[in-house]
């Protein structure tokens, strides 16, 4: 990674621009757009459309297009369009605007990406895992030992000028920020750029990279108050909590106590105070949770602190119910597409003392995840796989495809759902979802062939069922042979990019 960063640094001449604090001249370098669009450095991202528009394929065509578009963005009256600028109206303008936004986002990411290389910024490298992969060991190993959890919804949207002021502290390049302001004002829905829901902003589809950069920078600033949590590492390790129950509980008490120095003038016993408990923080998309072993009063203080920080620093008002404080033993919270909580599981321990033995009844806390069936059915309703009552219907849009293509599409969705929710404690709730998809597939085939579901199932036979079974189910059943597979949680590290039907908010 560092070698690649050095090569890119030398190629982009970043050293010279960093000393002058200017990123704006990089907009007129064609290789920026080639790198932003994953093209080769020798190919031109502008050549193909310029051939259709009558441009000469020279080296100045891309720079000319960028200059003209930037000029149009800086103009105050967007209704004045000359005849020579007719190429930038309609779908052509949308293409060039998207192209420049991709390159512009890549340029704006340079100051942030430099921080990832410790040798460039001369900072210490943090060894803790600040990614989604660190969420799973936190849920499995640490959450069951905590008492309270705050379910936090990151406030949005942020005003454009406040966002630019925040970026000004990170990017000291006035021309680039001014161009960003003009570019955002060019779109009427710029106020919804910071909304994490993809369906609320067409800008996220046309300029996804710039949208992600703006949203990540906004979330980064919202989380800046929690920067001290970097010092607390959360490595990928799994330690069973069933062994040494009493000893673990004893040392857990000792860790949270400190002895105050005794004053010689007062003949009193040593005073014991509780340490300030550690606050754990994890986030996925626009939702985050804070959990701790502290009291409800301290959690309310944290809530008050976060709300005031967002209001004073970003002028953001937390949404009604944006922060919920619940006790883990009595309430569940919705996170990562699961309804999660901590439940007490009865446990019997056999104790042996010399020749006598006796049984001890105790209870241990266990992290529990449940697949919320109603939100998933709501997602299937939006995708038109079933009605509001959960009754499967045919997917008429796919009726023109081949039989194998229809079966493969439904099977792909079913496998992704099973793959994503493999971390559930009770997988039998997914049987209804699989039934809806399987019957919707049969109804789609029956609609195509103008037949009935019974005839389709009899004709296809096992072929219709085999597509909905995954190879990984056979592998997992072989690994966990002799155990109850439905009660085993298996977290796959690629679930962040496979399931679009899971409602995360």
From Swiss-Prot:
Pfam families: Intron_maturas2 (PF01348), MatK_N (PF01824). The keyword ATP-binding does not apply. The keyword tRNA processing applies. GO terms for biological process: mRNA processing; RNA splicing; tRNA processing. It is found in: Plastid, Chloroplast. Keywords: Chloroplast, mRNA processing, Plastid, RNA-binding, tRNA processing. One of its GO terms (cellular component) is chloroplast. One of its GO terms (molecular function) is RNA binding. Usually encoded in the trnK tRNA gene intron. Probably assists in splicing its own and other chloroplast group II introns. HAMAP family: MatK (MF_01390). Belongs to the intron maturase 2 family. MatK subfamily. This is Maturase K. The gene is matK.
